[in-house]
Amino acid sequence: VGLAAPAIMWLAFVPMLLVATSYYYLNRVDPDCGTTFSWATKAFGPWVGWIGGWAIIVADIIVMANLADIAGRYTFLLFGLDEQADNKYWVMLIGVLWIAVMTYICYVGIEASARSQWFLLGAELVTLLIFAVVAPYKVYSGNAPETSVKPSLEWLNPFSIDSTSSLTAGILVAIFIYWGWDSLVSVNEETEDKERTPGVAAIASTIILVFIYVIVSIAAQAYAGPDFLVDNADDV
């Protein structure tokens, strides 16, 4: 999609906001930690509920394996161990260890999980916000790479994308990166004011995500340029 990546980010936000809003109202009526499984079963019958529940489980397994691979690889890269980062067995081992750590935190209890999430998410958001400020500053001050380009409002225009297939593919990928806000509703039975708080948190999360994704995508392609990002797609 070229320079229209920020447009893809806000377009993908629209269906996510609608789904989050539906979760809000469903949770108000029936705050059940089974979420999709429970609600679909009550509305459409056990078959639809079963399919919905298993679809989430299968997706979780695929995503967990993918994220474990990323965590394993970048753990080595963080310490400059490039050789180990290119070894799938070492990466798999560290990825499994990360899964074990997360499983233990979940076993300890929801409060430990919440505290760890506050720390990790806070560090992530602060880092991304700093990048979103520093990168454009370097572009306008002339200290960015030669491939850099100055931001433009046209980047937010989805109609600048000539190919319908590229637009569709971009939205599908962008929807995937919004993954995770629904976990807020899955802990509704362990939340104060369970009829309201999880749903509000879900909607707020999608709004925060679209803000972060749009400004970071603008900053990244402004600093490095779209061609550089395409050539190094595995790293971004």
Name each region found by the language model:
Residues P31-A40, Y104-E111, V185-N188, E192-G199:
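Cytoplasmic juxtamembrane interface segments
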Residues G2, G34-T35, G45, G49, ...:
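Glycine-centered flexibility sites
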Residues S22, T75, C106-G109, A132-P136, ...:
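Hydrophobic membrane-targeting signal helices
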Residues A5-M9, G80-W90, F119-V236:
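Helix-loop-helix junctions that connect adjacent transmembrane segments
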Residues Y25-R28, I51, L97-A123, V187-E190:
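Membrane-water interface regions at transmembrane-helix termini and the short interhelical loops
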Residues V1-V91, S205-F211, I215:
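Extracellular loop-to-transmembrane helix junctions
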Residues G45-V58, I94-L97, S160-A174:
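Select transmembrane alpha-helical segments in multipass membrane proteins
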Residues A12-Y24, W98-Y107, W181-D182:
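Central hydrophobic cores of alpha-helical transmembrane segments in multi-pass inner-membrane proteins
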